[in-house]
């Protein structure tokens, strides 16, 4: 983009632009017509049959490998971004030829060969090559109207990566990239994008004054082989100040729907729909002041997680969080609102402790096993005396459960109020 100079506007006509890597200058704008696609892969069209397998020769790409030790259970070659797709579906990598099966591929890096487990003839086969679509440290860049897909983005890196200040990334479809779909830095905005089916995670961001609004974030975190509880799922935000996450629809991700982790302060989650994410809904972890309000949650974390893990709203070793006016439907399983304290040390603004959190005026629909409350496996006394409070909430359960309400120990709803003084102005509706 150097030919246009700083502040230039570029227009991409409809069409597929393969293996392009754009490094914007200060203030540049990149716009796409409907049907403009940045595709980080090459088409594979020539195959030979070798010992009953189909082989593409001359594959010299080898993407940067990060965090190969952060593997999901049973995954092979996690952190290897050299993805292969058949008809827009990512195949599963295996690490030896004798494990090749239908739906898998084996990349023999020594021989520069990709082996496929299925006959590719008549199919569209693509191999991810380029590590990013649009990325630079310039400030004030705008990216809008593009489809960005199939980039060999390393773990924790993004296909669109605004590493400078004030990027605006809007109205794009970002899909099928190995690592992360979109990343921004301070005073950046991610607006009205459809971010889906990326291998590790949909979004990430860090810095001050960030706005995440109006995005659909769906079905991310399923195929990179990286453990999503280490980092993956819908979106993760780190070391932010004044982060606003508003009116997004985050659903069906493998991991948390939305996640603030490490030294986030003055965070707001407002008006989001968070549905059917495997690990839980919103997780605010080892961070500080936040407001989580007027969000709706359905079906998050209902995958057999114990303790208060998998809550629709989960606060881990964080303080000064107000949780109010949320609607939580956990009738298919999972926990409601969980405050969790463990031994996590200290961060930029003090100890990572679960204190001074207020949970009020929320409506929850629970199973008889779904939990609510505060638990600790470290310095429980500090958490219990730390000003955490539950009040004026409404709980709906199909039948009366025993010991669903936690404040250190577990209690019935009646004893949650009578013994520990929580939820005194709340109600439990059975049936």
Where in this protein do the model-derived segments appear?
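Extracellular parallel beta-helix/beta-solenoid repeat domains
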Residues: 1-431
């Amino acid at each position: 983009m150097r030919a246009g100079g700083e502040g230039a506007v570029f227009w991409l006509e409809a069409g597929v632009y393969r293996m392009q890597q754009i490094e914007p200058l200060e203030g540049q704008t990149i716009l796409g017509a409907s049907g403009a696609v940045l595709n980080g892969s090459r088409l594979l069209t020539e195959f030979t049959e070798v010992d009953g397998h189909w082989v593409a020769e001359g594959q010299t790409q080898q993407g940067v490998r990060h965090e190969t030790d952060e593997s999901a259970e049973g995954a092979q070659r996690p952190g290897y971004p050299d993805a292969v797709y058949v008809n827009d579906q990512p195949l599963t990598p295996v690490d030896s030829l004798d494990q090749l099966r239908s739906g898998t591929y084996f990349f023999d890096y020594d021989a520069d060969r990709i082996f496929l487990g299925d006959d590719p003839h008549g199919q569209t086969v693509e191999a991810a090559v380029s590590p990013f679509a649009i990325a630079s440290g310039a400030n004030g860049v705008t990216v809008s109207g593009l489809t960005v897909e199939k980039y060999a983005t390393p773990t924790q890196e993004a296909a669109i990566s605004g590493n400078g200040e004030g990027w605006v990334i809007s109205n794009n479809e970002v899909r099928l990239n190995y690592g992360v779909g979109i990343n921004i830095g301070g005073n950046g905005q991610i607006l009205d994008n459809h971010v889906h089916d990326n291998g590790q995670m949909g979004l990430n961001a860090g810095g001050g004054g960030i706005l995440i609004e109006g995005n659909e974030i769906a079905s991310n975190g399923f195929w990179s082989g990286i453990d999503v509880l280490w980092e993956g799922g819908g979106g993760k935000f780190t070391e932010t100040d004044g982060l606003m996450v508003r009116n997004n629809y985050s659903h069906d991700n493998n991991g948390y729907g939305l996640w603030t982790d490490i030294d986030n302060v003055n965070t707001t989650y407002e008006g989001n729909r968070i549905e059917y994410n495997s690990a839980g809904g919103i997780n605010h972890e080892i961070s500080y002041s936040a407001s989580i309000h007027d969000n709706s949650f359905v079906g998050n974390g209902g995958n057999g997680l114990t303790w208060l893990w998998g809550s629709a709203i989960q606060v881990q070793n964080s303080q000064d969080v107000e949780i109010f006016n949320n609607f939580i439907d956990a009738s298919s399983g999972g926990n409601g609102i969980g405050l969790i304290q463990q031994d996590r040390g200290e961060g930029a603004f003090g100890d990572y402790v679960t204190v001074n959190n207020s949970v009020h005026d929320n409506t929850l629909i629970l199973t008889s096993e779904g939990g609510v409350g505060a638990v600790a496996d470290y310095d429980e006394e500090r958490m219990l005396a730390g000003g955490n409070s539950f009040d004026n909430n409404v709980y709906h359960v199909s039948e009366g459960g025993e010991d669903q309400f936690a404040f250190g120990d577990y209690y019935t709803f009646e004893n949650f109020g009578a013994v520990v003084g929580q939820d005194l102005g709340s109600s439990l509706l059975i049936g």
